[in-house]
Amino acid sequence: MRQKVLITGANKGIGFETAKQLGDKGWTILLGARNEERGRAAVKTLENKGITAEWIQIDLNNIDTIHAAADYIATQHSDLKALINNAGISGNMNASPLDVELDELRELAEVNFFGNFEMIKTFTPILAKNHGRILNLTIPLNPNSFFHPFSYIATKSPLNSMIKLFGRHFKKNKIPVEIFGVMPGGITTDLNNHQKGFLMRSVNEGAQSIVKVLTDNHNHNGKILLRLMPFKIFK
């Protein structure tokens, strides 16, 4: 039987490449995207490669789309095996802390933190029926000279704590779901205006890291994995 995965923000970038690589391994792809035209176009591209895929409308800024997607998947794809929380927004990556507007910070938090929280909470009951996995794309906690976008780090890094807390809750209450985070490294995408450099990796390389962890059959519950060489695990 084909295993099924839901990937948010999967119409482009590392999300789409992850969908393609998992599809090549025989997974059925539920492609989460806000925009119907772009989502269906991405599905068509996958189908042309022989991959079974379906567009699912998910906008992390709109809780109703999350709940509607969960209701649909619970009835039509109740054997969902994995959720990849990939979607996120970066805001102005060059703005200093004193230049960031509160409205922008709230907008990013709505997607990067609250939206991902609602995805985890809403889809856990479906995944628990299938001993499923929740993989969250995340970033390093500490800014450095190479990577220090204030709004993005401030709204994305709390996800790491949330992963650990959900993992602890799942283990304590014997909920058969694994939740973990993956930091695939610096990936050249439109999120960073296609930044390049010796520390940056292609979407193909980044997706390989994600696929490897998702399918490795090791228990990563509550852990954050950083793509160095090999993966480093933060407990």
Where are these regions (language model features)?
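Canonical Rossmann dinucleotide-binding motif of NAD(H)/NADP(H)-dependent dehydrogenases/reductases
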Residues: M1-L30
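A glycine-rich helix->loop->beta "capping" turn
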Residues: I51, Y72-L83, G91
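Conserved glycine-rich Rossmann-like NAD(P)H-binding loop of the short-chain dehydrogenase/reductase
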Residues: K25-A41
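Structural signature of the Rossmann-like NAD(P)-dependent dehydrogenase/reductase core
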Residues: I7-T8, N85-N86, R133-I139, E178-M183
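Catalytic loop of short-chain dehydrogenase/reductase
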Residues: I89, S96-A109, F117, A128-K172
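The beta1-alpha1 cofactor-binding region of Rossmann-like NAD(H)/NADP(H)-dependent oxidoreductases
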Residues: E36, Q57-A69
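C-terminal helical subdomain
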Residues: V177, G181-V182, T189, N193-K235
